[in-house]
Structures are given as structure tokens and as C-alpha cells.
Amino acid sequence: LFRSTEISVTLQAARRYAGSGRVITIFQPHRFSRTQQFAREFTQALKNSDLIYLLDIYAASEKEIPGVTSELIVQAGDERFIYQPSMISVVESVASLAEPGDVILTMGAGDVTALAPAIVTALSERFA
């Protein structure tokens, strides 16, 4: 369960670790009801990142709520917030933009963590 406090603390630690590097976050909101209730809090917490990719909401067997999408978080953010429903596109984008020293985080309670190995592989190929 990711709430805004946990996100903020994690991103503060990532910022310290990154030093002069960037913090790139891939966030997958968990449940439509939580996204509806906490969209602004998520946006504020995620602002500690230099670049934020928002995947589609991980429903976790919850029914869709009309009008509630990850774009609520993106719209409350700024130009650093990017809605990207395609996991393949996120991997390609992060792998093409990341530089040595950047910290890349996957956050969420869904299948977002499955992206980490693909990102590592893509970066390994790029910087080989």
C-alpha cells in the first residue's frame, strides 16, 4: 500500500542517493477509489521526482470508476508528469532518457515492479 507519506519519504531518500543525478519515477496507482481520493496527495508526493511516468491504475479487482484515471494525477502536476499506459513504451522512454547517476524507481502495488528487469536490460544494452 503506497500512500503519499511513503512516496515522499522514498523519493527524498532517492534524491539524496542520486546526488546530481535525476530521480525518475514510474508510478502505478493502486485502485480507482484510492486514486480518486488521493490524486492531489500523490501529485504532491511525486513532485520530488525530476520525471514521473504514470501507468494505468492497477484495479486489484475493484470496478472502474468513470472519469478516474491516472490522468487525474498528471493533470494536477506539471510538465514532468507523463501519462503512459504502455509499459513497453515506458521502458523504451526511460532507457533512452536515463543517464549514468540517475535513480530509477518503480512504485505501486500492481505489476509495475515487473518493469525493473526490462529497464536494466535496456540500459545495459544502451551503455554496453
Predicted regions and their residues:
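ATP-dependent carboxylate-amine ligase
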Residues: 2-128
